[in-house]
UniProtKB/Swiss-Prot annotation:
Keywords: RNA-binding, Transcription, Transcription antitermination, Transcription regulation. GO terms for cellular component: cytosol. The keyword RNA-binding applies. HAMAP family: NusB. This is Transcription antitermination protein NusB. It comes from Nostoc sp. (strain PCC 7120 / SAG 25.82 / UTEX 2576). Belongs to the NusB family.
Length: 211
């Protein structure tokens, strides 16, 4: 793991924790964070296994179609599309697995630096308490799409970035760059480009309102 600033580690912990929140996030304390992250590790491992299984199934389907298809263009195109889907599944699994092997060190760093825990908890609380406002901002920047239809990991990355823009006074460019880096680690192959595009529209809208 490359050396990272406390807020970068906290941001990652917050991302991983959003899907593991207790019923009442307001009761979340620094003492609860390690347990929250450990629960997240177990969930991510299960997701990685599911993704690997899906990738294996898609690769097998692609291989079968390539072996059995005729030379007709439609069959070859179908086989090619299936193979591309399989590659996408595999890439997502590799990204998730690569991130999960760093969790032990991530937890250790979080335990050593109190700022990490405080910032992660603050992020999670703000996102929970201001979710409707944050989601409204995201929705306004989506093109023919809804927040609820986004993949959970992409939705949570966007929420973290918008929360930092709106409530932490983090410069828009910094929030966008940090979100893109998170997307490269946890989202699909094209996830970081999608995240970048949405957040740049959010930034443009905020600038327009401030004029």
């Amino acid at each position: 793991m490359q050396d990272r600033k406390p807020q970068q580690i906290a941001r990652e912990l917050a991302l991983l924790s959003l899907s593991q929140l207790p019923l009442n996030p307001k009761k979340l304390t620094e003492e609860h964070l390690p347990k929250l992250v450990l629960a997240t590790v177990r969930t991510l491992r299960a997701e990685v296994q599911d993704t690997l299984d899906n990738a294996a199934a898609e690769l097998q389907r692609s291989n079968d179609r390539l072996l059995t298809s005729q030379t007709r263009a439609s069959d070859l195109n179908t086989a090619r599309n299936m193979l591309q889907e399989a590659i996408s599944y595999t890439q997502t699994a590799i990204n998730q697995l690569g991130a999960s092997v760093e969790f032990p060190e991530l937890i250790q760093l979080a335990n050593q630096d109190k700022e990490v825990g405080r910032y992660a908890i603050k992020l999670v609380k703000i996102i929970n308490e201001e979710r409707s406002v944050i989601d409204e901002q995201i929705t306004s920047a989506l093109v023919d799409w809804q927040v609820t239809r986004l993949a959970q990991i992409d939705r949570d990355i966007l929420r973290i970035a918008v929360a930092e823009m709106m409530f932490f006074n983090l410069p828009n460019s910094v929030a966008i760059n940090e979100a893109v880096e998170l997307a490269k680690r946890y989202s699909g192959d094209e996830g970081h480009r999608f995240i970048n595009g949405v957040l740049r529209r959010v930034s443009d809208q905020k600038k327009a309102l401030s004029v």
